[in-house]
């Protein structure tokens, strides 16, 4: 196991040079999101010293979107690249762990020539036709794995942003399928799409065949006099609750921000899209709540 203190400042080719023959790095993107496929990439860098074109390359999560796009183009120019993915249906059927391994195997098989050795980020080893070494925090240690992490991340992000044009209510253009507040609200308002992972919470809890609570929720402008009486909180995440009035109309969120529970007002205007900081209880936006409990929120919103 690799400790953080032992990580090099930048990924190197030291692990690649320990092995004879051709070496590829493999990494994935998209294990945690609520929607979209999991994508893996396999990268074989050219032999010789560290390419100057990849100076500054590291784990894709530590790079800006602009840097990732730049390195993506550079990697495509100098390296052999294979990309594989596992669909939402495969994720739900196999589970995310086995779907992840399947995507890695497909990425490996998509390379133009089979490597002799594979360095894989993490602890799990996909079944490949060569020697496989799992490297904890490999995207911080191996340049090949870092390159694969960028290719996988950019490929998947592009896919999700394209889907956002067809499904604009979930914030995929920015969250690329991860469980942000906007994504959760989109699920409540519009329900899951064909691209959502039905085996993942909250999709498999809120929208299970036995669950009906969400059907009474309304996402519309509140035209009448607002009242805090009879408010209801609906659990979304450990740090996030949706707040509805007694008629089932959505009026806000209770969110844990830096250890403090906070009320965020939400209003609905033309087109039915939510807007934070507006709505009938906008004057309370950003105020603290003692706990994520209906009575605590009622107490806050009933103050003068």
Predicted regions and their residues:
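RNase H-like, Mg2+-dependent phosphodiesterase core
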Residues: 1-218
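Hydrophobic residues embedded in beta-strands of well-ordered beta-sheets
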Residues: 27, 240-242, 261-262
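Residue-level recognition of conserved beta-strand positions in structured domain cores
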Residues: 44, 85, 245, 256, ...
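Solvent-exposed strand-loop boundary residues in beta-sheet-rich modules
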Residues: 48, 247, 267-271
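Negatively charged, low-complexity tracts enriched in Asp/Glu with abundant Ser/Thr
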Residues: 212-246, 272-280, 284
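Intrinsically disordered, low-complexity regulatory segments enriched in Ser/Thr/Pro
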Residues: 252-282
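Ampiphathic alpha-helical segments that act as solvent-exposed interaction surfaces
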Residues: 275-304
